[in-house]
UniProtKB/Swiss-Prot annotation:
Protein name, UniProt field: Serine hydroxymethyltransferase
Catalytic activity: (6R)-5,10-methylene-5,6,7,8-tetrahydrofolate + glycine + H2O = (6S)-5,6,7,8-tetrahydrofolate + L-serine
Extent of the signal sequence: none
GO terms under cellular component: cytosol
EC number: 2.1.2.1
Native species: Acinetobacter baumannii (strain ATCC 17978 / DSM 105126 / CIP 53.77 / LMG 1025 / NCDC KC755 / 5377)
Amino acid sequence: MFANISISEFDPELAQAIASEDERQEAHIELIASENYCSPAVMEAQGSKLTNKYAEGYPGKRYYGGCEFVDVIEQMAIDRAKELFGADYANVQPHAGSQANSAVYLALLNPGDTVLGMSLAHGGHLTHGAKVSFSGKTYNAVQYGLNAETGEIDYEEVERLALEHKPRMIVAGFSAYSRVVDWQRFRDIADKVGAYLFVDMAHVAGLVAAGVYPNPVQIADVTTTTTHKTLRGPRSGLILAKANEEIEKKLQSAVFPGNQGGPLMHAIAAKAICFKEAMSDDFKAYQQQVVKNAQAMAEVFIARGYDVVSGGTDNHLFLLSLIKQDVTGKDADAWLGAAHITVNKNSVPNDPRSPFVTSGIRIGTPAVTTRGFGEAEVRELAGWIADVIDSKGDEKVIADVKAKVEAVCAKFPVYAK
């Protein structure tokens, strides 16, 4: 029998680290595009007794007994995911977005097959063919990028590379791209060369669910996403697909037993909650505000003389180039962190600096919008960021901005005390 003892009583050192993180989340402004704040209900599910249950297999086809209730939970998550995204198939077991992506590769490809994906340096993801990832080591990865003049995806290059290399699979999706992706254009290119079309919509899944960004699910052969970011659920993954019995069978076996063992039932329950939350009118209004806030911030930076890659944004994020300011992304990240504004350094297209230094920062609005920030607050925030960068990290400017950040964070708490 376990003693009824708290973390602070049992492990004060760990409790202090957790408390410090709690304080950081409340007292700092979060602008990392892939981060958000999930609801108390989502966190409650993740801390439930479901964490104790092993459930290898799928609902009704488990390798362990005692799964009658987790079967209900997983089927609920599956049904809600299909309804939310208009999918014919859903697998809610992937532990994360990268695991979902690796399962797709395992299901549809053989080692050495050619994959055409977006370059990491131009806004793609590690799992889209980067050399340091399994996707670039196991498969023959060919990379496309952005048009140098527009800062948007170079679809002509995508088509040229597809015709030249005849990939088995084309990957559409991104981790740092601010415009609407033409999913149908990718579909047409894939069909020309007989390739699968795989869409990774991890960054925009919440926008898609709310109908403020085009839905790729019935266009692509397979679509994956994380369940955090704009979807505002637990840190986990999801695979979706349109009807295709052969692909569905391959995906099922690629996730289990191909890529994972037992599913995380506490996380799956949390996904079921976040899918239900995403069906609400409040969630739709939230996603609309996320985009409005990102566009408002981009406008301020442009007015202050900064270059925004592609000239603006249609979603929740944008890349701010600091080449003209002769500031590195690494320095800007550090200066803003000292002012309690969290961003991440990010390479910009054709960046002359290394990925560890970079010439830009990525800014996203999902978390600040969850806090309740509207256009007025984010415009003011963008001005503070520009002040810090323009000052080249002047200590007085940082201190002044930090005080303003603390005041606005107190006005807009993440969680009610």
